[in-house]
Amino acid sequence: MGEMENIIYSIYHPTILVGFAIGILSLLAIGFQKNDLHALILTDVVECAMLIIIAGVGTDLAEALILPGLVVSLAELLAVSEVLITRKYLKSKRPKPKSYKLFEEFKLPLYTGELKYDIHMEILKTSPKFLAIILIVYGAILSGFTGGAVIATGLLFYALSQRVIGVEISEELKTMWEGISGLSGIAWALWIFGFIGFFVFPDKWLLCLLMAGLGLVIKVGSKLGLIGYIGEVR
């Protein structure tokens, strides 16, 4: 047991130095980088370097911080990648490839030669809203990182289902969705304050827990939900 502790202590300082070195070098490389794709990859490298520093602490709290950090960084990477792909597509002005949608069996050829939906099922319009509301409410009850992921799943399911059945999302909902995504920075600050409050005000642990949980819900839910919003705009 003593030898294992000595090994852990011996690699702590090199781990912290390696993490800081990778982060600083990646930030310098981003400053000199002109390619958007390379800058995106380097940004993800910086996030991995910060996770290395957190992992070097080797405590249960550090372990709890690694998973939310990985998922939030992945959500940001996917969202920015969607923006870059869309911008590249608009610049290239290439013909849009044919997209295949669900419910192809409900499409019947008309005299004009076009394929249009020739069926009206109420469940196709109401069930996505019902399932999305259930997921959002359940995610709000869970709170924290897991709750944010469940809420994001409900938002993505609603956006994708509306696109599949050919129904456009209302402008009011798009505006509200964009506003929630804009609260990402505020949610992150709320989570930081709640996290610090555990140590500064231990007697207020319940309030700090609710603050941290609410911050993670908004942060993760808005980031993952942004993917469906970008796809709808595109």
From Swiss-Prot:
Keyword Transmembrane appears in the UniProt entry: yes
Localization, per the record, is: Cell membrane
* GO CC list: plasma membrane
Q: Which UniProt keywords apply?
A: Cell membrane, Membrane, Transmembrane, Transmembrane helix
InterPro entries for the chain: DUF2105_membrane, Prd_NiFe_hyd_3_EhaG
Which ranges does the record mark as transmembrane? 11-31, 52-72, 131-151, 182-202, 207-227
Pfam families attached here?
Answer: DUF2105 (PF09878)
- Transmembrane as a keyword? yes
Highest taxon of the source? Answer: Archaea
Q: How does it sit in the membrane?
A: Multi-pass membrane protein
The primary location reported for this protein is membrane
**Protein name as annotated:** Uncharacterized protein MJ0523
Q: Which organism is it from?
A: Methanocaldococcus jannaschii (strain ATCC 43067 / DSM 2661 / JAL-1 / JCM 10045 / NBRC 100440)
Q: Which lineage is the organism of this entry classified under, starting from the top rank?
A: Archaea, Methanobacteriati, Methanobacteriota, Methanomada group, Methanococci
